[in-house]
Design a protein with these regions (language model features):
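A glycine-rich, often tryptophan-bearing local segment used as a flexible ligand/cofactor-contacting loop or short
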Residues: 84-163
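Amphipathic alpha-helical scaffolding segments comprising HEAT/armadillo-like alpha-solenoid repeats
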Residues: 278-286, 308-320, 339-350, 373-376
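Catalytic beta-strand/loop cores that center a nucleophilic Ser/Cys/Thr
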Residues: 147-221, 229-236
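Extracellular ligand-binding/catalytic regions of CAZymes and related secreted enzymes
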Residues: 23-27, 99, 126, 212, ...
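Aromatic-Pro/Gly-enriched surface loop or interdomain linker
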Residues: 20-72
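Short inter-helical turns and helix N-cap capping residues of alpha-solenoid HEAT/ARM repeat scaffolds
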Residues: 291-292, 322-323, 354-355
Length: 376
């Protein structure tokens, strides 16, 4: 009995040492920033890690990896974008450095293109580290939008906040359709299943994405790999799922995030962008350039309601529009979509705002957005 007690204590200490590595016991996360990574995906991934009080985050480049930055990190994230281009930007030697990093007991999370990069997909430049392969790659541009998923029993342990829900919803953007690899004997655990059939674009076939793995997780040497075909980091109320994935890769305990951070009820239905929606979305780009204040506000209303992927790249400058009403609506858009990458811009807009009523409203939006961050 005493021997068993000592064994349990020893295992707990091993588990603690696996994640108490960084300065001040904070886990050090590196987000890859290279050619092929979408800029907004990088921004959003950084913002998601900032939600966790036990983590610090920085970007890393292919040169940083070659220069040994991995020795100063506990986990890395390969963000969305274009996986094969990120492969080319990394280079084979750096990919082997990443493999060795994981094998040594560290963690890796791949998001969408990052998950694609981790697969063993014939005819696609990839790293062969998650036990899956992508199929129907000729229809990768199948569409995007808020999509449904359900958790498996293992997924409910990792995401207990969602355990009682039949379905939850996050942004999906042309992520890989995964099946088990034929060539790599690397078993993975399916943490979630995609429930949405996405085939809005590219002549993609029906019934290809639904009932497929949404999140998969696997051991790799002494470390762990987590692959997400979707974009929780780009989904208001669900960004916290990314640091939770990092926690899984490092065997860290599950901790609760605030109610301001965890808000799965923001989306309770699918919102897939149709071809007509995409045309309308593109038209609003010109609205923001040449439209009246009333037209700009109507555009922001529609883009927020349908969770436009592209609008987040357009709204930043509207904080400094000539119209106070547009400035206020842009501030609300940023706050209500939890867009932390523009927190400093919103703070500046509040500081320079000349209309007192608009300033007060914008300050409320700023405080609402800032409340996502843990108290220091």
């Amino acid at each position: 009995m005493l021997r068993k007690t000592f064994f349990i204590i020893a295992m707990c200490l091993v588990g603690l040492s696996a994640w108490s590595m960084g300065v001040g016991n904070k886990v050090r996360v590196g987000v890859f920033q290279g050619n092929g990574g979408a800029q907004t995906c990088i921004w959003e991934t950084i913002a998601s890690i900032q939600l966790d009080p036990d983590m610090t985050v920085r970007t890393i480049t292919t040169g940083n990896i070659a220069n040994g930055v991995l020795k100063d990190l506990d986990a890395i994230i390969i963000p969305g974008g274009e996986g094969a281009t990120q492969y080319m930007n990394l280079g084979e030697e750096n990919m082997e450095r990443i493999r060795n990093f994981i094998r040594s007991g560290k963690g890796a999370v791949g998001i969408c293109a990052g998950a694609y990069l981790f697969t063993d997909t014939p005819g696609y430049a990839c790293m062969h580290i998650n036990g899956g392969k992508a199929i129907d790659i000729e229809h990768d541009n199948r569409g995007h939008g808020i999509s449904a998923f359900s958790l498996t029993a293992e997924g409910k342990k990792l995401f207990p906040e969602l355990a009682k829900r039949d379905k939850s919803y996050v942004m999906y953007y042309e992520g890989p359709v995964l099946v088990k690899s034929d060539n790599i004997p690397l078993p993975y655990t399916t943490m979630a299943i995609m429930e949405t059939d996405v085939h809005e674009e590219g002549n993609a076939p029906a019934n290809m994405t639904n009932n497929r793995p949404f999140f998969i997780a696997n051991e790799y040497g002494k470390g762990r790999v987590f692959s997400s075909i979707s974009h929780p980091e780009a989904t208001p109320g669900m960004m916290w799922m990314i640091p939770r994935m990092v926690r899984w890769t490092l065997r860290m305990p599950v901790v609760a995030y605030s109610k301001r951070v965890v808000n799965p009820d923001l989306y309770n239905r699918e919102i897939l962008m149709t071809k007509d929606d995409l045309r309308k979305e593109r038209g609003y780009y010109r609205t923001f350039l040449y439209g009246s204040p009333k037209e700009k506000i109507a555009a922001l209303d529609w883009l927020q309601a349908c969770r436009s992927w592209d609008a987040k790249r357009w709204v930043q400058g509207l904080l400094f529009d000539n119209s106070p009403a547009v400035r206020e609506r842009a501030a609300r858009f940023i706050a209500e979509t939890d867009y932390l990458p523009f927190l400093s811009d919103l703070e500046t807009a509040c500081r320079v705002e000349r209309d007192e009523q608009t300033k007060q409203s914008m300050m409320r939006h700023f405080e609402h957005l800032k409340a996502l961050l843990p108290h220091k």
